[in-house]
Each structure stands twice: as C-alpha cells, then as structure tokens.
Amino acid sequence: MFVAMLEWTQCAAVERVPGKVSGAWVFKSTRVPVRALFANLEDGATVNEFLTWFPGVTREEVEAVLEHAERSLTVA
C-alpha cells in the first residue's frame, strides 16, 4: 500500500499525535486511521460506505485525503 510513503503533514484533514492510535496518521479529531480509507477502497467499498462505517469522518475530509494522495503521486 502506498499510503505510508506520502507526506501527510501538508494535508489539513489529518493529524498525527504521539500515543493516539500508535502515532498513525488519522482523520483529524478522530481515531480513524487514514490507511482505513485506502484499505476499504481497495476491498471494493465506496466512499459512501466508508462514511457510514466511520461517522466521525466527513466527506470533505475524505476528498481532501484523496486529492492529497493524487497530488502527491503526480509530483516528480
């Protein structure tokens, strides 16, 4: 999975707090790891399903994470 290689400090929708979910990148003000979004999408889930399963995450945050990942992958 490519998520670990991205520079998440520039994405306002996520945070990394020592001691919170073992220091993993999570959606801001939640305990939902960013990797959960990508894992669910890889498994065939839709964004709507993800939002239903993780009600603390907003559509805007998911879109920001996906846009950040896309931009990060297109920068050489």
Q: Which residue stretches match the model-derived regions?
A:
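Long, charge-rich, low-complexity alpha-helical segments
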Residues: V32-A76
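Short, intrinsically disordered or compositionally biased N-terminal tails of bacterial proteins
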Residues: M1-A4
